[in-house]
Each structure stands twice: as structure tokens, then as C-alpha cells.
Amino acid sequence: MKPSFLLCAVLGLASTPAFALDPLSYAHYDQVKTRDVHLDLNADFAHKTLSGYAELTLDWLDPAARTLDLDTRGLAIARVQALDAQGKWTPAPFTLDKLDPDKGQALHIALAFQPAKVRIDYQTSPDAAALQWLTPAQTMSGKRPFMFSQSEQINARSWAPLQDTPAVRFTYSAHVTAPEGLRVVMSADNDARATGKGGWNFTMPQPIPSYLLAIGIGELEARSLGKRTGVYAEPLRIKSAAYELADTEKMVEAAESLYGPYRWGRYDMLVLPPSFPIGGMENP
């Protein structure tokens, strides 16, 4: 009797899904996964919004799937397009579910085929959960506004339509425009010598979960701390920030002596205005 019981147990396991989907995400990443995200955004401090588009590169896992479900929260979706086999962007119908207080809104995109890419034109809400818009009075100089993000735990969906779950990791790039005199930084490769003329460009070549998407915009200066370490801060704070963090390069070297080469390229830090209410957030 034991072999029969064992066989039944094995058959029972075979019919069970390989894994449970994230209950706080609308994404069906067992059918399709995001491989790369490109963001093209404009920062509007007067209206406290980011607007533009997100372009998602997809890996389809289920040949029968014809719907892409994404996580959003408070996003105004203007248009969705899918890239066809001829390289042409074609309109794709979409619907937004009612707002759930915990999960936000599901964006359902109906597709006639399995596109390699989809592009979503959208605008964030002025009260987007992940974006903090500071007035000049909340900065050290008191002259210019400031914005920073906090995507953890599931707030990335409030500033980009994504598969907002740690079960999905993707590379990303971004082009961001901001008012003159303000620097944009992101959780990606930042060029300290960039001027922002024509916009700010970023690339993250290593796959990350959505909660590690980060952006900061403000009156910022860059200071080198070593061959691959640096700090960004407001002009009135950059000197003290660089002094406080002067041993960062040594710290990275000490970590490498224990655990091997540092794999993220650069180790840069952003020191936020004094009104920042959180101790800190680590981003690649």
C-alpha cells in the first residue's frame, strides 16, 4: 500500500502550481515577465507630477497569454501601444480597475499578439505615494524645490506602471527633463559631469526589483570621494557631507576584502534636505 500512497502524493504535487503569485501585485508574471524598462519623463514642480511614458520589454512565458496586467496607483493612463512584428507601434485597448486601498489599480492591457514591447503614456498624481515634493522652504538654501522618491515597499506603481513585485527583476534606462538649475539623479549610472542640457540620461544594466527604482531632483552638487565613490548634496551641505563620508572608498575596499569585488560599478550617495523624514534607503 505504501507505493500507491507515495504515487498519489507525487501526482498531487504535480498538479500544484510551482509557486504562489505575489498577493500584493496584480501581475501574472507566470505568463509574462518584464525584462527591461525605459522611462521618458518630465518633472513638473508646479503641478507636482511626472509625465511621459514607460516602455516595457517583455518575455512571454505562456504561448496562450494575450493580456498584460500591471500595477498602478493613481496614474492617469493616456495611451497604450504595442510593438508589432514590423516594428510599428499599434494602439492596444486597456482598462483600469477600481482603486484598492492596499494594492492600487490593475491596468489590464488586451493584446492581439505577444509584443516584444509595450509603451504606456501616463501622468502621476500630485499625491503619488512614492514621490515627495518639497517646497523651497523645506531645503537648506530655501531657493529651489526638491523631489525624491521612496518606492519601497509597493509604491513604485505610483510613479510608473510596472509589475511591482520583488518576484520580477529588470534592467532599466531613463531620460528625465527637469527645470533649469535642478539636477536629476537615479538609482542607476549617474554622470557627475553631466549638465542636463537636453535632459538627464541613466542606465541600470543589472536587474533590480521595482522597489529599488529611485529618483531625486533638486539643487545638487557632486563631490568625488574616490575612484568609484561620490556624494550628491545641496550646495550648502556638500562640504560637510563629503567630510562625513570621506572613508566610503575604504569601506568598500574593506567589504571587498571579505566578500569579493563590488559588482555595482559605482557607490554614490544622495544626502537629502533636513526635512527628509526617514533614516535612509539603500538603492543600487
Kindly give the residue locations of the regions a language model identified:
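Surface-exposed beta-strand/loop patches in extracellular or lumenal glycoproteins
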Residues: 55-75, 163-164, 172-179
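A surface-exposed beta-strand-loop module
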Residues: 74-139, 201
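Glycine/proline-rich low-complexity spacer/linker segments in large multi-domain proteins
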Residues: 29, 107, 122-172, 218-225
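Hydrophobic helix-coil surface modules that form long, contiguous segments used
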Residues: 52, 150-154, 162-284
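Intrinsic-disorder/low-complexity, polar/charged segments enriched in Ser/Thr/Lys/Arg/Asp/Glu/Gln
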Residues: 36-38, 49-55, 65-67, 106, ...
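N-terminal, polar/Ser/Thr-rich
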Residues: 18-53, 63, 141-146, 166
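Bacterial N-terminal signal peptides
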Residues: 4, 8-16
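Short structured motifs
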Residues: 22-24, 36-42, 103-109, 156-161, ...
